[in-house]
Amino acid sequence: MKKLLVASSASAALFAVGVGANAHAAEDNNVNQDQLAQTALNNTQQLNDAPVQEGAYNIAFDNSGYNFNFNSDGTNWSWSYNADSSAQQAPAQSTTQEQAPAAQQAPAQSTTQEQAPAAQQAPAQEQTQQPAQQPAQQQTQQPAQQSADSGSNVQVNDHLKAIAQRESGGDIHAINSSSGAAGKYQFLQTTWDSVAPAEYQGKPASEAPEAVQDAAAQKLYDTAGPSQWVTA
């Protein structure tokens, strides 16, 4: 299905907006990784209520058997973690928030799953296109195993939910063979690259986890409006 494109700078995109280079890169590397990892594992509400630090940052590291990522463009922030390659698989966790201007912090907009006590986990495997799937429902604490791209803690508005159903039936791996549009929201590649995190740019949206697709769609909706989807 043909989409309208949005002109923007791919280098300025981040997790909810795309992740790009910024003047705080050196500062990001000086965070206390042990403390930040423990906060993500045991005090998720603190990360939901406020960013790791003021301004833009892009922090990624391995600690305590998990891979951690913390991102902000100075306005929106997000964080996530999943298991490293040495353990048994358990639910991955991520969240995206909007940062209030200056020193004032905006209230948290989304909830996360409470993480079970630390256990051995294995890395989630990225999947290619799969048969149509229904969106995973957010659940409270569960020990059951699931892949990192199933379900999403990113909250999108009701209009976007309806758009996703009309575009792909909610299938995050859907690909339109005619237009090349891909993913839950049927992004064209150039549009996807303008709002996707750096590590997913240049790849079809269908290869990104559902949380990443949701965050990118909400950003596109907020900045360019629903006219980007012909089914809107």
Curated annotation (Swiss-Prot):
Gene3D superfamilies, A to Z: 1.10.530.10
Keywords: Glycosidase, Hydrolase, Secreted, Signal
Location of the region described as Disordered in the Swiss-Prot/TrEMBL record: 84-154
EC number: 3.2.-.-
Membrane-crossing segments per the record: none
Entry keyword Signal: yes
Main location: secreted
Molecular function terms from GO: hydrolase activity, acting on glycosyl bonds
Residues spanning the signal sequence: 1-25
Annotated Gene Ontology cellular component terms: extracellular region
EC class of the enzyme, as a word: hydrolase
Biased composition (Low complexity): 87-148
InterPro entries hit by this protein: Lysozyme-like_dom_sf (IPR023346), RPF (IPR010618)
Record localization: Secreted
Function per UniProt: Is able to cleave peptidoglycan and affects clumping and separation of bacterial cells.
Recorded family membership: Belongs to the transglycosylase family. SceD subfamily.
Name assigned to this protein: Probable transglycosylase SceD
Lineage per the UniProt record: Bacteria, Bacillati, Bacillota, Bacilli, Bacillales
